[in-house]
């Protein structure tokens, strides 16, 4: 029966299982012999057990498991030997003896085990034995077996390496220099073995070998960890011996995987203080690394680590004699220079780290930040980059770069001090410029940054011009209406932050802003010009407040209203009607309230402009009713007109109301006009209400007449009730022309018509309205106010 093919994983598990079983058998025998004090037999079983490590069949992962199992058993042997030597057994004989083991792998593992025990028992032999052991390990040149053997040597000697602060006889026991030499040599040899792994086996297994090498890298890195743990390794020794030795090995091995891992290892395991004193040699080595090494990640890791160190509250910070930013700036430039094929996004990533470093270590040095931006501009010029696509990696990195100053300063005015910020902005394509412009404006709004001068306004407007004016590179298709409205609302809100303490300066700021916004095209100005008009009205009120200290305030107010008029006119040219109409009405109110010289003329002009817009531009009946109601409401609040101007305006309102297309609209507008003849005010009566009772009655009678002409019965009754409420209002305001008889007639009319309406939700609403009106009258009749009219004779 044919056997089924095993998967590589199953094969590995089977081989490992067999090896572990053999280890268990031999270790059991070894321990039995040790318990019976049969040392020679025990060593024979130990040698057999170690023979399992001679295999070439296991993957690094499986070999590691086997190695760990054997290491644990060897520890038992080490403890036994230590006890024996303490009792007086001769070590020298044993050290000689294990050298006769048949195979080199078992022999060297046993030599290390015995050698370590020897050193612990007789420290005076330490220097020679350590040298002996590290040299002997050269005997195993198979990468996998050699790496684990040397790792065993490193682990076993962990606690016996000479270090600072212990009494020593340097001739025999060695000193810190011997420890550094020992670990550096072991590191160099392990790195060579590790690098050599890539050349073993078939080229088709290359990817698998690279994966296996990745798994084994920690064995090589452990040497660097060991060096960093030696107390005797101070800054001076690190600079002169340790780093020099490591970098020499790293640069010379010419292997990208090893170089990248070991450089990152150096950054991680040694203290920040050491890195600060050795920046130049480390960064110079970066420039010499293999072309396939991702140098960017190495440099960024170092920069980020030192930036954190500088930022630590409890730390000493960066020593003043170390020009950290300058060193990194120069060395990063050298690295970029030495790597012509470095991807553009990696080049920008390095600048991102540099700018982070400048921000964290030198928060007050705006020039350092600008230096990074300038370098980036120069790099882009060399690469002939322009309009970088939003989707590209370079665009993402450039976005990160430019967001850092925005987020760190949280003040656009500081960002504007960076001369190279705007030039870099221009490298983006349309989409990226637009999203970055939104980002900048959102930051201004979030932090309420006030823009206080014309130059600042100019600079910001130019920076975010993608939101303010059409661009040559913008897409042909129309933008999404919602997105467009959101972007423009952002700009509109920003206008309210253009404010100077000095009113004259504020006027110049608004003028500058209008120049930019005026060129925005019809779609944009409906969002951007109205806030500008309101800002102008606010400024006019400020001049009024300053009238005691500024004798030219009235002329300045006229100038402001002229500015507002021009700005609103631009909206009319953009074929907008309702928006400019509202702005003219607001202007008329403002002019009337401020009361500067010529204010009546200005207010009249603004009112008549609103009328012109109403008559010429608004044709939709709903919009017409809303507009005339607004005009009447605004005019009713104004008290700056003489009778000469007030009379034609109120007549005009009444006329316009009666000319509305739909009868219900006419009725409502005409009845609203009644208020103009009652509570309207002019200068001839010193601002007191007109109280023209007769004209009020004329309006209300006309409204009733119009309501009578309505064909829809429910609409007709509804209008009657609304007009009844107007009558009641004026009766309570003590208009003599409105009598109880008039009220009774209208109530009777409504009572007659209501039952004829078809049953519906609308009819229910009408009934409710009428009921509420009668309830009001009932309450007034039963408990009349002392000053109010008496409802005597009212029939309810």
UniProtKB/Swiss-Prot annotation:
Top-level taxon of origin: Eukaryota
Membrane topology label: Peripheral membrane protein
Region of interest (Interaction with IGF2R cytoplasmic domain), residue spans: 500-693
Chief location of this protein within or outside the cell: cytoplasm
Family matches, as Gene3D superfamilies: Vacuolar protein sorting-associated protein 35, helical subcomplex Vps35-C
Keyword Cytoplasm in record: yes
GO BP: any one term: retrograde transport, endosome to Golgi
Subcellular localization, as worded in the UniProt entry: Cytoplasm; Membrane; Endosome; Early endosome
Residues covered by region (Interaction with SNX3): 25-44, 205-215
Region (Interaction with SLC11A2): 438-796
InterPro entries with a match to the protein in the record: ARM-type_fold (IPR016024), Vps35 (IPR005378), Vps35_C (IPR042491)
KW Cytoplasm (keyword) present: yes
Keywords tagged on the record: Cytoplasm, Endosome, Membrane, Phosphoprotein, Protein transport, Transport
Cysteines engaged in disulfide bonds, as pairs: none
One of the record's GO molecular function terms: D1 dopamine receptor binding
Annotated positions of the Phosphotyrosine modification: 791
Record PTM Phosphoserine, positions in chain: 7, 783
Gene Ontology CC terms: cytosol; early endosome; endosome; endosome membrane; late endosome; lysosome; mitochondrion; mitochondrion-derived vesicle
Quaternary structure and interacting proteins, as annotated: Component of the heterotrimeric retromer cargo-selective complex (CSC), also described as vacuolar protein sorting subcomplex (VPS) formed by VPS26 (VPS26A or VPS26B), VPS29 and VPS35. The CSC has a highly elongated structure with VPS26 and VPS29 binding independently at opposite distal ends of VPS35 as central platform. The CSC is believed to associate with variable sorting nexins to form functionally distinct retromer complex variants.
UniProt record similarity statement: Belongs to the VPS35 family.
Function: Acts as a component of the retromer cargo-selective complex (CSC). The CSC is believed to be the core functional component of retromer or respective retromer complex variants acting to prevent missorting of selected transmembrane cargo proteins into the lysosomal degradation pathway. The recruitment of the CSC to the endosomal membrane involves RAB7A and SNX3.
Protein name: Vacuolar protein sorting-associated protein 35
Taxonomic source organism: Bos taurus (Bovine)
Designated gene of the protein: VPS35
